[in-house]
Amino acid sequence: MPSLKDLRNRIASVKATQKITKAMQMVASAKLRRAQLAAEAARPYAERMDEVLASLASIVGTGPDAPKLLAGNGYDRTHLLVVCTAERGLCGGFNASIARLARDTAEKLIAEGKKVKILCVGKKGYDLLKRQFGEQILELIELRSVRTIGFVNAEAIGRKILNLYKDAEFDVCTLFFAKFRTVLHQIPTAQQLIPLAVKTQEDAPAAPPSLYEYEPSEEQILATLLPRNITIQVLRALLENAASEQGARMSAMDNASRNAGEMIKKQTLKYNRSRQAMITKELIEIISGAEAL
């Protein structure tokens, strides 16, 4: 049975941990609001880009003369998986869920005889995947020093993806991230970037079709928009990830604070019972000694 001193030290240790988890919860809560607003602001632009590209793709088609970023290079042998996770932990299963989706996808592709290459954005994804896919990981892109995710960060990643594609390093590129829904709900998502996954009529929401007139030609517009779309989709993924990370961290730290509170109650109860038993024992010894006299 632990001594009173051990119980006091244990209670003090848990209380110190609870202070840290509460502070982290408050910081995550403050960051969440900004990250959520940024993610929500990026969605309409990315969705409208999808609509315009879908309209252009329906006109141009995916024949041999179509842009490679739209129709692909005709092969499906090498896949690039761009895995976006956080730089830090203590955010529940946020990083693990994205890494798990990427791992399952990689294992399925390898089982089909495909070659897999991985580009990790965020150290935690790299840490989770390096043991199994160390040889397939091309590079780790860290954003630890970035205070606010912006277009410049996404543009650098998008440029790297495009350069790898121009160098024929892969045939298909898929982006992995977590879509933010609520503080308690983040959805691990795999989005194909190259070739462009154009929404079909069944996928599109029921709405009257929009009529567009394009100047210059559709092919010229596609040649400009397709590389930019890579950057836009990467930016959207990074912003969704940032909001999802803070939401997951806030929830995880809230649960940790609650668990610490429960542990403090249990240890305090155990401490009081031990102290009461010790006092009772001492009283019995005093009374027994008095009766002996």
Swiss-Prot record:
CDD domains attached to this UniProt entry: F1-ATPase_gamma
GO biological process, one term: proton motive force-driven plasma membrane ATP synthesis
Subcellular localization(s) per the UniProt record: Cell inner membrane
SUPFAM superfamilies: ATP synthase (F1-ATPase), gamma subunit (SSF52943)
Family per record: Belongs to the ATPase gamma chain family.
Record's protein name: ATP synthase gamma chain
Primary location recorded for the protein, binned into one broad class: membrane
A single cellular component GO annotation: proton-transporting ATP synthase complex
Keywords: ATP synthesis, Cell inner membrane, Cell membrane, CF(1), Hydrogen ion transport, Ion transport, Membrane, Transport
Lineage: Bacteria, Pseudomonadati, Pseudomonadota, Alphaproteobacteria, Hyphomicrobiales
GO molecular function: ATP binding; proton-transporting ATP synthase activity, rotational mechanism
Quaternary structure (record): F-type ATPases have 2 components, CF(1) - the catalytic core - and CF(0) - the membrane proton channel. CF(1) has five subunits: alpha(3), beta(3), gamma(1), delta(1), epsilon(1). CF(0) has three main subunits: a, b and c.
Membrane topology: Peripheral membrane protein
Gene (name only): atpG
Signal peptide: none
Biological role stated in the UniProt entry: Produces ATP from ADP in the presence of a proton gradient across the membrane. The gamma chain is believed to be important in regulating ATPase activity and the flow of protons through the CF(0) complex.
Annotated source species: Beijerinckia indica subsp. indica (strain ATCC 9039 / DSM 1715 / NCIMB 8712)
